[in-house]
UniProtKB/Swiss-Prot annotation:
The keyword Cytoplasm applies. This is tRNA modification GTPase MnmE. Belongs to the TRAFAC class TrmE-Era-EngA-EngB-Septin-like GTPase superfamily. TrmE GTPase family. GTP binds at residues 226-231, 245-251, 270-273.
Amino acid sequence: MFKKDSIVAIATPPGKGGIGIIRVSGNLSVKIAKIFLKRLPKEKQAEYIPFYSKNGNTLDQGIALFFKSPKSLTGEDVLEFQAHGSPVALNFLLQEILSIKGMRLAKPGEFLERAFINGKIDLIQAEAISDLINSCSIQAAKSALISIRGYFSKKINNLILSIKKLRMKIEVDIDFSEENFNKISIECIKHDLEKIILNINKIQCSFNRGAILKEGSKIVIIGKPNSGKSSIFNILSGNNNAIVTSIEGTTRDILHEHIYLDNIPLHIYDTAGLRKTDDKIEKIGILRALKEIKTSDHILLIVDSNIDKSNDINLIWPKFNSNIKNKITIIRNKIDLSKEIPEIKIFKKNNIISLSAYTGEGVDILIKYLKDLNCLLLNEEGCILARTRHILEIKKAKNNILNAKKLLNKYNLSDFVSEELRIAQSCLEKILGINNNSNDFLNEIFSNFCIGK
């Protein structure tokens, strides 16, 4: 599906630079080349030639590239002028090209929109290009590049294919069976549904890791009053925002710092000391601390090694909720007083780090541990930098698959199962942009790009 009009835009950032690129796409690309280059460059070959005005005056000299449809970024004829990065010269050449009848200035993201419309990329890949441009770390850039190369798209396409095959199997049963499903069919379909749900769960886990990569994991520091929580918070955040005193209950509200470890974002939360208290303000702080614990990715439980001699979390904190024990690291602080050595070890599946926030002994162990922890959270089967629409559509698809499973278990109703699968397939196709080419929808996606992309 080619668009009839031709577009042009400066494809490099505003301002002076070593190079400035003007990109043209559409049927007029050949005509533009003959006017402003005096000839059509060889296809896919960089040529160093003069750039001319309409009147034949030399404007600049640089590299010209021509890509013939459909073997181009947009799927249309594409011409690029790679000139010196002078804003004045670039704008003059741009205005000259725009003066040719049938040429117009490209809208933000329109080159990529045409690439999508012409089947060169899907919506996931287009959005991943935006994620790559806006990435704040090497890891985020790598993850975006994986999606550009089709990793996420392949996962969704495989799900769609699985659902299509299952729908065909069900519809054959409907056509050739007097009753609904026989026992063999039911077991086969149940197995296929379970497999689809499992693959959706894996994708959702990749979404969670992608969110950590993009937004940062949440590390909550907890412990009894005066155990050294705020001192460790200050060390990790690199400042002294938390007040440190020997008075119990000094921290009464949540303190939050956003830091980077090896270019991976990390959110550190300092909380009120957890204890029984009659102080109304301190009680509010403790309730807020408990709320942060529930939404954390990992917990650092700070203990005073000079008082708490045990490494067993059940003895340190007997009433602690059992379902979050697996994401707790025990930090044995104040080893300068207890005379323990700085180290990391494992006791009953909990990592234990011995350090002194006062002297700095063992702090390097904690920093390295947090870096490794981030890598562990991110490296399981890859990360997907998911958009809100991806998350919502995959959730809808999963709900439809679960509904299909319930209908199969309870009623053996083939028509209803097939319909739930059809809706699930439609949700997954929306992620790729299949059968969803309305102007409003595409404008919402591509208007976030810069002009020239």
